[in-house]
């Protein structure tokens, strides 16, 4: 490129059109030297046809000349000048002033030669969407490799280079260009031209591919018409355009209709496949139901059941809106049964059956889901089928066993009527469930004897022993081996070992840097206990040592800690990172499992069994986990818990937790919905006697089961933020 730009620096006298220029110059000189010149005007026009330019004038000036890109300006006497520089918008050269100063006519009686049409309309087949701003004034085509002169005009590089070799003036304004090297690339124009070409190619591509090959020629003509002036279209052209547009419209409508039918067909096929899968599933479930019904009928023949009383309300299946369709004839009275013939049967059987049917109706969807999840998990041999059916029968029996919650006794943790806060934070039974301890924000631990509380006819109960701490108490835990050994944690981060019957302190641990939320004794190792704190540490303590024996870095505030009931080495704790962490104490560097699923901080983590953990969070959910699986087995919803510690306890089958609507909620571990609830009465103090019951912000804050050695556990104790403690029984 540099070599081509530097090659040649010829002047105007050596241009390819020097002969034509000299003839015009001589004619002008002769006219100016005549004393009385005739009235003659010189006009030059370059006609673009076949690459030949001709100049004509009166008096025989000029003949056939070589085609030139730019002719130099010729000056004559009288200030007249003839210029054949091609304009931006015209194919013809502008006529110059002739003798006598006339610049527009050849004489008073001469005819005017009409100017040609503008560029784009003057070119044949110029349907391209050209812009005059991008047309080279020399070659009348789209600029290729735009270069700019000092005067600011842009041309094709080849065109301006060749023009300047012939003449050192700008073809647009006759500005003198001293050196051919004084050309500069116009990057902006090049970029705009490139975009213009891309738009044109996209437009051409769409039009070329929108019709079939049979109509390609007609659409090519249609494209040509789009680039022409509207005034040049006649009626035949317009009719043809309308015909093409109508054809295109019909084609698009047909394609649209075909697409709609295709979508409809796909929807119908997917719906049919889903329904077939559902039908297959229903058929499998029906076969399982028929099999189990026969098995239960065979088992019923081995017993002599008490006949049903006709006065007992029959079980009514939920409506189809509850996703349960049950044949009503299955629950109709057997033939020959009458109320009079059965009135002498056991009344307890009738009442029990009626209450269980009521609970079955209320929770039919959950029970149905539980049944099929149990039975359809693995369909194998008869022994496996029998065990699955027995498993569901046990689940159904436990779910329908209890109908209500009955209060047995009421206690008060509040010290006086004017005490503003009496929140009970923890309740725990001792090893033999003979005594229970209550602790909370009043900084006191009160120990009561269970039998005394239950047997007293009065509502005022006094503790067997009372211990006072230096700070608010967050948690307490009884030793499973030493009946009198009790541990407590408080808001100062202190862990204290007490003699629960004498009230004496045996150990004080003060290694936590922040508030300690939880403490728990190891059920298998009576000397080991653990505590969790806001300092993101879980510390392990030994009752015969003054310092901690190990520490686990949790990287988040620890809200609860609990040992496994079946292993001395396994520990679970919940954190503010929304997770439950499960550790083996033989390797405290990393957890065995991290259970993720809660949306907020985990406030409690309790073992339901040696393999199952239930966790509570301030996202108003309980979640059941298996220690060997990272996913949640079941979520329990119904209670409200968004900011407070509301308590959590389990006896192996049932889970109890508090709620921020001042109620106690009970769940069965096999079903997600609430089993039973118990509402605490709002006890107003002297200062709150004018406040409405709905305005209270009381919540159940602690709960504990009374687990008997034989495994039966239908008694629990719950307390709320007012300091009211209820001993409750499931009936």
From Swiss-Prot:
Annotated site residue numbers, Interaction with TRIB1: 472, 491
According to the record, mutating residue 159 to S results in: Loss of MTA1 ubiquitination and degradation
Q: Motif span (Nuclear export signal)?
A: 235-245
Single GO cellular component term: nucleoplasm
A Gene Ontology molecular function term for this protein is: ubiquitin-protein transferase activity
Question: Catalytic activity, per the record?
Answer: S-ubiquitinyl-[E2 ubiquitin-conjugating enzyme]-L-cysteine + [acceptor protein]-L-lysine = [E2 ubiquitin-conjugating enzyme]-L-cysteine + N(6)-ubiquitinyl-[acceptor protein]-L-lysine
From the UniProt record, give one GO term of the biological process aspect: response to ionizing radiation
* Post-translational modifications reported in the UniProt record: Autoubiquitinated. MTA1 destabilizes it by promoting its autoubiquitination.
Q: What is the effect of changing residue 139 to A?
A: Abolishes p53 ubiquitination and degradation but not that of JUN
Q: Which SUPFAM superfamilies match?
A: RING/U-box, WD40 repeat-like
- Say which family it is in: Belongs to the COP1 family.
Q: What does this protein do?
A: E3 ubiquitin-protein ligase that mediates ubiquitination and subsequent proteasomal degradation of target proteins. E3 ubiquitin ligases accept ubiquitin from an E2 ubiquitin-conjugating enzyme in the form of a thioester and then directly transfers the ubiquitin to targeted substrates. Involved in JUN ubiquitination and degradation. Directly involved in p53 (TP53) ubiquitination and degradation, thereby abolishing p53-dependent transcription and apoptosis. Ubiquitinates p53 independently of MDM2 or RCHY1.
Q: What is this protein called?
A: E3 ubiquitin-protein ligase COP1
Q: Lineage, please?
A: Eukaryota, Metazoa, Chordata, Craniata, Vertebrata
Name the encoding gene, please.
COP1
């Amino acid at each position: 490129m540099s070599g081509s730009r530097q090659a040649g620096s010829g002047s105007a006298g050596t241009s390819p059109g020097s002969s034509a220029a000299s003839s015009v110059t001589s004619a002008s000189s002769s006219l100016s030297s005549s004393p009385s010149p005739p009235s003659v005007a010189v006009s030059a026009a370059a006609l673009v046809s076949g690459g030949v330019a001709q100049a004509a004038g009166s008096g025989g000036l000029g003949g056939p000349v070589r085609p030139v890109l730019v002719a130099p300006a010729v000056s004559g006497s009288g200030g007249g000048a003839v210029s054949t520089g091609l304009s931006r918008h015209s194919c013809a050269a502008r006529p110059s002033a002739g003798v006598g100063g006339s610049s527009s006519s050849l004489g008073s009686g001469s005819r005017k030669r009409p100017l040609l049409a503008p560029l784009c309309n003057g070119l044949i087949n110029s349907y391209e969407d050209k812009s005059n701003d991008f047309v080279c004034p020399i070659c009348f085509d789209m600029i290729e490799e735009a270069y700019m002169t000092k005067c600011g005009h842009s041309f094709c590089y080849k065109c301006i280079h060749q023009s300047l070799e012939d003449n050192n003036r700008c073809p647009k304004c006759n500005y003198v260009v001293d050196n051919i090297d004084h050309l500069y690339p116009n990057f902006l124009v090049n970029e705009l031209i490139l975009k213009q070409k891309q738009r044109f190619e996209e437009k051409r591509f769409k039009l070329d591919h929108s019709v079939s090959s049979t109509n390609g020629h007609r659409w090519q003509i249609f494209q040509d018409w789009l680039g022409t002036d509207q005034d040049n279209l006649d009626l035949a052209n317009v009719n043809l355009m309308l015909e093409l547009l109508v054809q295109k419209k019909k084609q698009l409508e047909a394609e649209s209709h075909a697409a709609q039918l295709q979508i409809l067909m796909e929807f119908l096929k997917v719906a049919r496949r889903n329904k077939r899968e559902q039908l297959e599933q229903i058929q499998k479930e029906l076969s399982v139901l028929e099999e189990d019904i026969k098995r239960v009928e065979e088992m019923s023949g081995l017993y002599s059941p008490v006949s049903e009383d006709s006065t007992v309300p029959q079980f009514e299946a939920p409506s189809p809106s509850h996703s349960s369709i049950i044949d009503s004839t299955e629950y109709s009275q057997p033939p020959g049964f009458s109320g009079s013939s059965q009135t002498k049967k056991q009344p307890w059987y009738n009442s029990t059956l009626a209450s269980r049917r009521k609970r079955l109706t209320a929770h039919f969807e959950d029970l149905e889901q539980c049944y099929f999840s149990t039975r359809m998990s693995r369909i194998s041999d008869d022994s496996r089928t029998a065990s699955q059916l027995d498993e569901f029968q046990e689940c159904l029996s436990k779910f329908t066993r209890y109908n209500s919650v009955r209060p047995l006794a009421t206690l008060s943790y509040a010290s006086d009527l004017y005490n503003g806060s009496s929140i009970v934070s923890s309740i725990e039974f001792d090893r033999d469930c003979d005594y229970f301890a209550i602790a909370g924000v009043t900084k006191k631990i009160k120990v009561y004897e269970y039998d005394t509380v239950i047997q007293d006819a009065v509502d005022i109960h006094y503790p067997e022993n009372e211990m006072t701490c230096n700070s608010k108490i967050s948690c307490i835990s009884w030793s499973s081996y030493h009946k009198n050994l009790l541990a407590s944690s408080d808001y100062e981060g202190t862990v204290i070992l007490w003699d629960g019957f004498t009230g004496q302190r045996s150990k004080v641990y003060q290694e936590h840097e922040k508030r300690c939320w939880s403490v728990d004794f190891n059920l298998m190792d009576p000397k080991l206990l653990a505590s969790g704190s806001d300092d993101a540490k879980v510390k392990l303590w030994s009752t015969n040592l003054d310092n901690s024996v190990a520490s686990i870095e949790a990287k988040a505030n620890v809200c609860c800690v609990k040992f496994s009931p079946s292993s001395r080495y396994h520990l679970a704790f919940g954190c503010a990172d929304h997770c439950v962490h499960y550790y083996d104490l033989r390797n405290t560097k990393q957890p065995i499992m991290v259970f993720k699923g809660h949306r907020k901080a985990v406030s409690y983590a309790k073992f339901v069994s040696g393999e199952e953990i239930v966790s509570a969070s301030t996202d108003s959910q309980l979640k059941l986990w298996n220690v060997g699986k990272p996913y949640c087995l079941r979520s329990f919803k119904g209670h409200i818990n968004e900011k407070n510690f509301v308590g959590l306890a389990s006896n192996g089958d049932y889970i109890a937790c508090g709620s921020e609507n001042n109620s106690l909620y009970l769940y069965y571990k096999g079903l997600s919905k609430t089993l039973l609830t118990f509402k605490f009465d709002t006890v107003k103090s002297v200062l709150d006697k004018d406040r409405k019951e709905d305005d209270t912000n009381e919540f159940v804050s602690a709960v504990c089961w009374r687990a008997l050695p034989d495994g039966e556990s239908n008694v629990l104790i719950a307390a709320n933020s007012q300091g009211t403690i209820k001993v409750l029984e499931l009936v």
